[in-house]
Amino acid sequence: LLISAGHTLNPNKGCGAVGFINESQENRVLAKFVVEYLKKLGCETDYHEVNIGSDYIEQQAKKANSKNYDLVVQIHFNSSDNAAANGTEVIYRSSKGKVFAQKVQDKLKTEFKDRKIKHDINDLKRNLGWLRLTNPPAILIETCFVSNKSDTDKYTSNRKKIAKLIAEGIANQTIVENSNSNTSSADKKLYAVCVTACEYDSAKKMQQELISKGYKDTYLIPR
């Protein structure tokens, strides 16, 4: 798999739209999270970005064509002069790309308005370079609208969740989050719990009470 961050960085030629969020920046943030989740699913995944260059689309396509990828994905955000425009859509050209597009769309529409999958030529009349110049099956994800406050609020408060949904759609798998996933290896060690320090008779009595409650490994240690 290849995950490509769309556009160059601002203010270079080919940079993305700027609204409530900066598309070029968020393309890179989201794409890297998607790669992270795909690797968790065991998918061999490469990441690519082109930050400057008038031929950035050709550079992106060259990377996509450099291996026999099962799928190449480019991350984008949509924009409109109409501030009310909102929702998510995945764009494709090939029949194989259409299958992947629908799987990702089915995931993203749980968070954003469903604008349906679209063929870049038949539906959008756009002949997109990413889909025109790439050899492997390819899709282009328009995550949501940078020009819509509701869309961007949903996105910025759930970046990793959105990335997880995209990864699940691409891989056709579900990621089960481990509630203890942030526990470090050091936290898996055993630790002694020291309660108090007192005279021998009191300490002995406390030890016996603890043993009677099932705490067999209870010791008296002189201080």
Description of each model-found segment:
Residues 11, 21-180:
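Active-site-proximal helix/loop segments of hydrolytic enzymes
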